[in-house]
Design a protein with these regions (language model features):
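Beta-strand-rich modules
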Residues: 1-14, 85-105, 177-197
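Low-complexity, Ser/Thr/Pro-rich intrinsically disordered linker/stalk segments at domain junctions
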Residues: 2, 59-61, 150
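Hydrophobic beta-strand positions in extracellular immunoglobulin-like domains
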Residues: 10, 41, 52-53, 67, ...
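Pro/Thr/Ser/Gly-rich low-complexity, intrinsically disordered linker/stalk tracts
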Residues: 14-58, 90, 104-148, 182, ...
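Short beta-strand elements bearing conserved aromatic residues within extracellular beta-rich modules
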Residues: 62-65, 152-155
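Short beta-strand segments within Ig-like beta-sandwich modules, predominantly Fibronectin type-III
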Residues: 73-79, 164-171
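Short strand-edge motifs at loop-to-beta-strand transitions and within beta-strands
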Residues: 81-83, 173-175
Length: 220
């Protein structure tokens, strides 16, 4: 990385000849290994945060990554941290390594870091809603996980205008929604929740709660 000004001259038994013209030269080598501090999963992506090593005396022009322990290397186009790896499959574990590239060639690869990308869960399917007294019972089937375990559901009783988190958290079916008014129609929708957040809502299914039985009359 240091620039030197070089001249040469020939020597024989008679002595030293005239020196050559001045030529500048900067020695260089491949860049040093980057240090990966984190690999953060996203929706079909992974974001790699790293600290660059020495550039070897020549500007780093690219960072490359491998997902197969160095068999195949792909360009990111990035020249600084962070870099984003895309087109991954949610729910699949990847072993990520990176290396720096300059005009001298490819540097040594970093250590491996595992990451599993994930996105929002798919919409659940409501198979039935049964009205009861001040409550409804919702039978549902989970959609896709998005690559991350479904941890809870949210529900709406007004066709998606407002949403309530299921408490306590549960992923079992059926789901009981209580605290409703008797003899009232409700338009039920459900969302699944995972580490990425709340997914899209199910289609709406309507149900009417039952009325409480009338008080009996004692005639004698």
């Amino acid at each position: 990385g240091t620039t030197y000004s070089v001249r040469i001259r020939a020597v024989n038994v008679a002595g030293s000849g005239a020196q050559s013209n001045l030529v500048s030269v900067t020695p260089r080598t491949v860049p040093a290994t980057p240090t990966v501090s984190s690999v953060t999963p996203g929706d079909s992506t992974a974001t790699v945060t790293f600290t660059a090593g020495s550039d070897g005396g020549s500007t780093v022009t690219n960072y490359e990554y491998t997902l197969d322990n160095g068999v195949t290397w792909l360009s990111t186009g990035a020249v600084a941290s962070p870099l984003t790896i895309s087109a991954l499959t949610n729910g699949t574990s990847y072993s990520v390594r990176i290396r720096a590239v300059n005009i001298a060639g490819n540097g040594a690869q970093s250590g491996a870091t595992s990451v599993t990308p994930y996105g929002l869960p798919g919409a659940p399917t409501i198979s039935s809603v049964t009205g009861g007294i001040a409550q409804v019972s919702v039978a549902l089937t989970a959609g896709t996980t998005g690559g991350s375990t479904i941890t809870n559901y949210e529900y709406s009783v007004d066709n998606g205008s407002t949403w309530t988190t299921r408490t306590p958290a549960a992923v079992t079916s059926p789901m009981t929604i209580s605290g409703l008014a008797n003899g009232t129609r409700y338009d039920i929708r459900i969302k699944a929740v995972n580490a990425a957040g709340s997914g899209p809502a199910s289609t709406s299914v309507s149900s009417t709660t039952k009325n409480s039985p009338a008080a009996p009359t004692i005639v004698s």
